Amino acid sequence: MENLILRPERPSEYREMEELIRDSFWDKYCPGCSEHLVVHKMRSSGVIVPELCLAAEENGELAGGIWYAKAAIRNGETEYEVLTMGPVCVRSDRQSRGIGAALIRKTLSLAAGRYPAVIIYGNPAYYGRFGFRPASDFGITDADGNLCPAILIAPMTDEIPGGAFDEGTVYHVTPDEVRRFDKTFPPRRKHYHSGQLFFAPPTPPPEEPLLYASWDLHRRAAKVLRDSRVLEAWESIGGKVCGVGSFRSNLMMKHRDIDLHIYTKNLDVPRTLEALSPVIASAKTIGLCYINGAGTDEHCLEWHLRMLDEDENEWTLDMIQILAGSRYDGMMEDVAEAVMDAAGPETRKRILALKNECPDDLKICGIEFCKAVIADGVTSWRQFLTWREENPPETPMNWKPDTEG
């Protein structure tokens, strides 16, 4: 570190800092990120602790930052005010140089004696070096009363009250909020990789049965994707994995299909087959179908994997390996993003209702439901059947919602 200065964040650099946060967290814990929006909301909240929100400046340039908010330990009707820390970010090209550690140590020293504790969700192996201990040692649980190894505490006084940790609502952002905020930044592709904690921002289960069924199927799909280890297989040959279709747009309903596009620098069939061999050899794998489209204008290889989940339900992973930089690079990812932008809560429910009413033996591509509802206002199964007679299946395949109007 050269000429490192830790100082309060300045309003004039808020946007630059949000860009830095977005860059440093992108694809780290889930496809894309939400930390830049969390900080944006935190600044206008009543819980931010501005004197502990520091910027790291190195050689006159922003290199990172740290943010604190007020939180609480709740014990019955009693509430004890504590601090929570995060996010902590360091510019991508300045990481692993001690800047993040310097921010943490500096702010913890500033907070000492002012609050009883700093409580966070984090990795014990990393944060232990700064004096954080398992919150369970102090009788502190999550908001639901469960002991959680990821809840850590840096005690600032000798007496720490037990109870349930409540980080407040400032850290809770919805996928819709994140997408809207992201529209104010340069577009950037979201990827899946094996090191991510989540394949979608974690949200509580919906109460409405239709929405719960979709939420639960997506949750199960994410577990299948993780348990199958296909991400590790693609990463072993440098593949960049993107979600498309209903899995990416959170519109899964009944069919256990996961659509993925994988971008590689070349289409080497033997190399890909070797990379996928551990997946193929799994006792959970039923079969693999391969289609060679490398010589077509689509420049792709299709790998259709059938496998069982832990409950012996059959899933299909439709993995399309596409030549990076070719004509179709990013096309369906853009469609999925546009569908999510266009599908508000009521529109989403109409799409899911049509999918739910669709007979199991009738194979209809998900994009048809989306086009029928979003573009043409279809609201019932009868209307959808009429609409489908007037719109041959190949027409929706070339459709993308207009989100600019």
Sequence positions of predicted segments:
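A short beta-loop-alpha structural element at the N-terminal edge
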Residues: L4-M17
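Active-site rim helix/loop that mediates acceptor-substrate recognition in acyltransferases
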Residues: E18-I21, F25-W67, A72
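Conserved acetyl-CoA-binding loop-helix of GNAT-fold acetyltransferases
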Residues: M85, V90, S96-S109
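Conserved active-site alpha-helix within GNAT-family acetyltransferase domains
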Residues: G113-N146
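Helical scaffold of the NTase/Pol beta-like nucleotidyltransferase catalytic core
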Residues: A200-V244, G405
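Active-site nucleotide-donor binding segment shared across nucleotidyl transfer reactions
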Residues: V230-L273
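Conserved catalytic core of two-metal-ion nucleotidyltransferases
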Residues: A283-L323
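Catalytic cores of NTP-dependent nucleotidyl/adenyl transfer enzymes across multiple folds
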Residues: T316-G405
